[in-house]
Amino acid sequence: MMKQLSVVIVVYNQSCRQSLTCQQLQKIPHTDMQILIFDNSTRDYGNRIYCEENGWIYLGGTGNLGLSKAYNTCIDYLKETNFHGYVCLFDDDTELTADYFNALQKAMETGRKIFVPFVYSNGRILSPCRITSYHKTILFPSEQAAAAYQGTDITAINSGMALSFSIFDDYRYDENIFLDGIDHTHLRHMAAKNIVVSILDVRFHHHFSGDEKPSKKSALIRFGIFAKDYAYIFRAKKPAYWYLVGKRALRLTLQYKSLDFLKILLRSK
C-alpha cells in the first residue's frame, strides 16, 4: 500500500541528529509516512548516512540551492514515484508533535488542499496571518479570529504547511526566489485558484531568526538575500519594494549603526 503522507524537511548547515524537527520526528510513530530530507548544507554533516540508517530519503547535498529549488526537487522526486496524497513541509527547527499528524489525518478526509497549524512566537500568533499587497503582515488577535476569517488575503509560513499533492500537477515554486517570500507568493497563487487555506487545531512554538541579533556580517548576508528576493517579487511594483525592504534596511542601519544595509538596498532594486 502506497503511503499517503510525505514529510519534507529542509536542513541547513547542521546534522539531522541535531535538528529539532528530526529529533521530534524520531519520537513519533511514522511507519505510515515517508520522510524526505533535503540537505542545503554547505559542508558534509553526515546527513546522508543518517538517512540511510533510518530509512529516510536523502536529497540535495550539493550546497545551498535555496528553498524553492529544494521543494521542487522533492516534488519532482515524488512525481517520479507516482506519489498521491499530502506533503508536509518543515524547517529543521520545528517543535513537532504527534498531535499535528493526528489532526492532519482527520483533516485530510475533508479533501481540502492546504492545511496550516497555529504558529506562536513570543506569545503571538505569527502564522497564519493576513498579508497586504506590500507583504505587510497583519496578525490575528486570537485563534478564534483566525479560524473565523473568510478573506482571501490569508497567508502562513511554510513550516507545518500540508498540501494536497494534486496542487503540483500544474504548479512549482518559483526558483527565482531563493528564500524570502516563497510562502506568501505561493499562497497568493493558490488564492488566485480559489484554493482555501484551512487551519488545523494544532499549535507550534517556533524559533525565528528575527527574534535574535546576529553578527553584522551575518545580518548583511541575510538582508542581501531578503533584498534580492523581494526585488524580484516586486519587480513590477517598485513602491512595494521601497516600502518593505527600505523599512527593514532603515531598521538594520539604526540597529547596527552601519550604512552597508542601505547600500544593499540600493544595489538590489
Predicted regions and their residues:
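Short beta-strand-to-loop acidic/aromatic patch adjacent to the donor-nucleotide binding site
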Residues: 84-95
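Short, well-formed alpha-helical segments that are part of the catalytic scaffolds
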Residues: 9-29
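Non-catalytic, C-terminal membrane-associated alpha-helical segments of glycosyltransferases
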Residues: 217-269
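Short, flexible, basic/aromatic active-site loop/helix in glycosyltransferases
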Residues: 132-154
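A conserved acidic beta->alpha catalytic loop
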Residues: 16, 37-47, 63, 94
